[in-house]
């Protein structure tokens, strides 16, 4: 029997929950409704939970309230994708309810689940039932009921998990698309897996790590992945330096403004995150040792990292020369108004830059940037105002979360595709106010229809369309409208659905995996079939999607 949970035990619950999710992330991914080749739910929840776990491991506390704060902050900054953001909000409310406690009993434990659900529902503008939210709510309601009958946290957690799994099995009855495909909700499954890890920890059991099956290389989104390539000799401060300092009682009193001013003398691209007991610093400098020595004035150095950016850049140049994929390492420029576009593909990034985007973040369907990735760019730009273009529905919530965290006055234009992002940026006026720009840019989205061509990763039937693994699919927004083994036939089927008598311009963005012969055939066919519609073509070099289309 476990009657009390303290910080040490809660930390173990987090670790086991994260490990269990990591072991089963590919299973959660396999439950995604649409058979597009993305990382999506399991990947994003895993990376989010891992961020929370790492935060806890770096700042262990016996007090559950203090540990909860750390866990919540780690999840908040590491949240990726909508599923990751919802997970972070669930545990944000969960942890908030614990903040005054050193230990909690079963009743308080149950109440924390309810607080998490309340926070998550408030954070989501349009909650959808049959998702992770429903599973969390049903489990929390069960927790409140069970806490009236038992003081044993093990018995309580077992019941919470049981009811979460019952709720999960019911999700297809609440969300028709799940029933059509024959799966349960992937986010709800991920949450149940975390809860199973919690139960293991409460029982004193541990979960062994399994060999990772995820393609981590396609998911890494470090800060040096964000930007365009520069010359090695142009790098003024060559060492990307990070440290975490735990404040000491007999050390120098921390004043964030003074700390920032002092740190800025060591270099640029300064990022300071102060979490009461710990300060995390990122700076580009020529003297990492001086940065660390300065940090020691305030307390104990608990995490250090130094990367030689000049050496990284030499490797990038060599890879480019050898025909490999370049990693971008451009310094983040300082601006008054940062216009930040999340982009996949070098060609698409160039389009955004040419239209006025000041900063790019590498990301898209297979690589959703975290809240912290977006926050870093805004902070490093030293801007007073920021505009974020997510350009993907699964990056929208992380963008909104980042906008709430940063000091700069920040708006998010709810672009859910690359064509929408381009249309919005076309209507951006750098001389106008944020409010006026937002109104104009959001309005422009209504005139754009977005389409895409990609391949299926499994057999399924959805939206009335039979789909075979490795066949091509044509999508309008998120809806699959056609599928064919032949790429050209898929494009023809997609255009038949997208183009009408009012269509004037078709923009085609060609991906890195597009067949040149097929692209040429598409051009000829479009000219012959739709002579009154102008075709604009761009080399986007995007992965996953052979073609992106917009019709206006």
From Swiss-Prot:
The record places domain DhaL at 8-200
Single GO molecular-function term?
Answer: glycerone kinase activity
Q: Name one GO biological process term.
A: glycerol metabolic process
Q: Name one Pfam family in it.
A: FakA-like_C
Q: Which Gene3D superfamilies match?
A: 1.25.40.340
NCBIfam families reported for this sequence: FakA_VfrB, YloV
Q: Which protein, by its recorded name, is this?
A: Uncharacterized protein SSP1546
The record lists the organism as: Staphylococcus saprophyticus subsp. saprophyticus (strain ATCC 15305 / DSM 20229 / NCIMB 8711 / NCTC 7292 / S-41)
């Amino acid at each position: 029997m476990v009657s009390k949970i303290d910080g040490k035990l809660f930390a173990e619950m987090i670790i086991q929950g994260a490990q269990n999710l990591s072991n089963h992330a590919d299973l959660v991914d396999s439950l995604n409704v649409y058979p597009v080749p993305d990382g999506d739910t399991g990947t994003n929840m895993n990376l989010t939970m891992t961020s929370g776990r790492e935060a806890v491991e770096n700042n262990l506390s016996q007090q559950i309230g203090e540990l909860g704060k750390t866990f919540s902050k780690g999840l908040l900054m590491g949240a990726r994708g909508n599923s990751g953001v919802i997970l972070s909000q669930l545990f944000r409310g969960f942890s908030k309810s614990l903040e005054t406690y050193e230990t909690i009993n079963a009743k308080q434990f149950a109440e924390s689940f309810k607080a998490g659900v309340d926070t998550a529902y408030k954070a989501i503008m349009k909650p959808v039932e049959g998702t992770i939210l429903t599973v969390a709510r049903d489990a929390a309601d069960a927790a409140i009921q069970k806490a009236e009958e038992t003081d044993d946290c093990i018995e309580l957690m077992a019941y919470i998990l049981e009811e979460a799994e019952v709720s999960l099995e019911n999700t297809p009855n609440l969300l028709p698309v799940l029933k059509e495909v024959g799966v349960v909700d992937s986010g709800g499954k991920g949450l149940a897996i975390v809860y199973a890890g919690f139960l293991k920890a409460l029982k004193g059991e541990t979960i062994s790590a399994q060999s990772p099956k995820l393609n981590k290389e396609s998911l890494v989104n470090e800060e040096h992945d964000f930007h365009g390539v520069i010359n090695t000799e142009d790098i003024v401060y060559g060492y990307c330096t990070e440290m975490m300092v735990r404040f000491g009682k007999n050390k120098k009193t921390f004043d964030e403004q003074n700390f920032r001013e002092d740190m800025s003398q060591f270099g640029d691209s300064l990022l300071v995150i102060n979490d009461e007991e710990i300060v995390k610093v990122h700076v580009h400098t020529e003297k990492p040792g001086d940065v660390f020595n300065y940090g020691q004035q305030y307390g104990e150095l608990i995490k250090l990292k130094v990367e030689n950016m000049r050496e990284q850049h030499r490797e990038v140049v060599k890879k480019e020369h050898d025909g490999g994929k370049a990693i971008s390492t451009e310094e983040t420029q300082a601006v008054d108004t940062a216009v930040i576009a999340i982009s996949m593909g070098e060609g698409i990034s160039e389009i955004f830059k040419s239209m006025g985007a000041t900063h790019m973040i590498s990301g898209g369907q297979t690589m959703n940037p975290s809240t912290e990735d977006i926050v870093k760019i805004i902070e490093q730009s030293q801007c007073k105002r920021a505009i974020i273009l997510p350009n993907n529905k699964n990056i929208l919530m992380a963008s909104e979360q980042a906008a709430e965290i940063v000091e700069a006055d920040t708006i998010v234009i709810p672009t859910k595709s690359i064509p929408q992002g381009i249309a919005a940026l076309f209507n951006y006026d750098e001389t106008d106010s944020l409010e006026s720009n937002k109104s104009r840019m959001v309005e422009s989205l209504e005139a754009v229809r977005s389409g895409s061509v990609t391949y299926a990763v499994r057999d399924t039937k959805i939206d009335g369309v039979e789909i075979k693994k490795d066949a091509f699919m044509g999508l309008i927004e998120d809806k699959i409208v056609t599928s064919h083994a032949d790429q050209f036939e898929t494009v023809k089927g997609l255009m038949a659905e997208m183009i009408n008598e009012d269509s004037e311009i078709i923009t085609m963005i060609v991906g890195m995996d597009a067949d040149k012969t097929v692209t040429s055939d598409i051009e000829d066919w479009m000219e012959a079939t739709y002579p009154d519609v102008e075709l604009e073509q761009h080399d986007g070099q995007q992965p996953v999607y052979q073609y992106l289309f917009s019709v206006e």
